[in-house]
Regions:
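Active-site-proximal loop/helix segments of hydrolase catalytic cores
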Residues: 1-62
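Binuclear metal-ion centers of metallo-dependent hydrolases, dominated by the metallo-beta-lactamase
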Residues: 54-105
Length: 105
């Protein structure tokens, strides 16, 4: 699975209506794949979203049966990998997330 730009795009600087629409659109698409099995998924994990950096990633991992997840959209900010590893929300799927060192040349 490759999410492309499909993500729960919440932005602190946007108005509430925009973020509500982003929430609606993301959850509508996720409902189409709820519970499906994926061997590998490439998912946005975007530090530019600040506190909401992992909303879409977390939702995907909790609502699908994904064997391995590869973060993308992290703009070479590899610190987001450790941030996710330290995030209590990731505990159920932490071992399935690719490690930052796998990306480095």
């Amino acid at each position: 699975y490759h999410a492309g730009d499909l993500n729960w795009w919440l932005w602190a600087g946007e108005d509430a209506a925009f973020n509500r629409q982003m929430t609606h659109d993301f959850l509508a698409q996720m409902a189409l794949i709820e519970g499906r099995r994926f061997d590998v998924a490439f998912l946005p994990l975007d530090p530019r979203q600040e506190a909401d950096y992992a909303e879409g990633f977390d939702h995907f991992m909790r609502h699908t049966d994904t064997a391995q997840a590869w973060p993308m959209h992290f703009w070479e900010d590899f610190s987001v990998f450790q941030r996710l590893a330290d995030d209590p929300r990731s505990a159920p799927y932490r071992a399935k997330v690719a490690k930052a060192e796998w990306y480095r040349r």
